[in-house]
Amino acid sequence: MTALLPFYAPFGLEAGLDEAGRGCLAGPVVAAAVILPRDFHHPFLTDSKQMTLRQRNELKRLVREYAIDYAIAEVDAAKIDEINILKASILAMHLAVDQLTHRPEHLLVDGNRFYSYPLTPHTCIVKGDSKYFSIAAASILAKVAHDAELYLLDQEYPQYGF
């Protein structure tokens, strides 16, 4: 059974944010924002890096089905080179929040750095994807989307072994 927590704030809509692709040498950085119902839980939902491809794909389907709202955004390699990977990761998270149709009242961010999002308080949680359901869900959506981008790059440039 998982030890993840359902939410951080005691009330309101809370979006979990995470990214994938910060350690990559190629491709975009991808971020996801996920708002889950307060009663959502799943015994196998955890940090996407701890899952198999099959588990991630199954949980991606489950998250998309049960989420109140979710969004995925990316920042391409050219922009990463222009502003640096940390700023690009945070930008991707902001872009994901921008795409949500529901306005969260609180943002739970995986990691220790984030630039304030307008009119929405946030809390940074180191290793948040192994502590909170919404961040773990965002971790899965971001990782699956990033892996899909790398697959496309591999098809176009097989000599690099993405």
Which role does the model predict for each range below?
Residues 1-162:
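RNase H-like, Mg2+-dependent phosphodiesterase core
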